[in-house]
């Protein structure tokens, strides 16, 4: 008949994402969502933002708790470790980080998740954490370079090393940065 229970689908997808999250307070990577296999990567890690959108539809507190765990535990780890590109976990729970490249799309994803959480939760600490992530665009990054140009509106694609900027400014990078700027004002 064409009826579709999207609430059920949202719940199932949300539970699936949460199952791919480390939930162990004794684990350094507590709160991390795996993106692929045994790996988290900076590129498009939109689980938190997607889960917040799911929470707004379902009001399922387990979804909100999952994103709060990510924000309280994993995001500070990412910030302290200068926004790594990738984290891979071995079968013995040892992990390795790859520091670069760092891309605007990756930082924008973390920022959006935190910003959405701060709005839903009305919590200033999450808003401040989102601002700590946004500072990457303003030069608080491993290259110590401002990534966004106020005069032209462009954003550089990313960072390829401690002092090496990818000065391309493709649509994806610029849009991610501009969306982050726009949501800061909201």
List the predicted regions and their residue ranges.
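Glycan-recognition and catalytic cores of secretory/periplasmic carbohydrate-active enzymes
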Residues: 1-186
């Amino acid at each position: 008949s064409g009826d579709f229970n999207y609430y059920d689908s949202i719940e199932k997808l949300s539970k699936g994402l949460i199952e791919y999250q480390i939930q162990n307070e004794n684990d350094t990577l507590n709160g991390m969502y795996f993106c692929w296999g045994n790996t988290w990567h900076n590129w498009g890690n939109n689980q938190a933002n997607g889960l917040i959108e799911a929470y707004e539809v379902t009001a399922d507190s387990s979804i909100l708790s999952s994103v709060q765990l990510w924000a309280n535990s994993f995001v500070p780890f990412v910030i302290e470790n200068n926004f790594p590109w990738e984290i891979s976990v071995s079968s013995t729970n040892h992990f390795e980080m790859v520091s670069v490249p760092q891309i605007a799309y990756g930082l924008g994803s973390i920022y959006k998740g935190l910003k959405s959480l701060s709005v839903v939760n009305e919590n200033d600490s999450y808003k401040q954490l989102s601002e700590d992530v946004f500072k990457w665009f303003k030069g608080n990054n491993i290259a110590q370079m401002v990534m966004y140009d106020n005069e032209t509106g462009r954003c550089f694609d990313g960072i390829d090393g401690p002092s090496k900027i990818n000065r391309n400014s493709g649509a994806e990078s610029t849009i991610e940065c501009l969306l982050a700027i726009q949501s800061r004002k909201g």
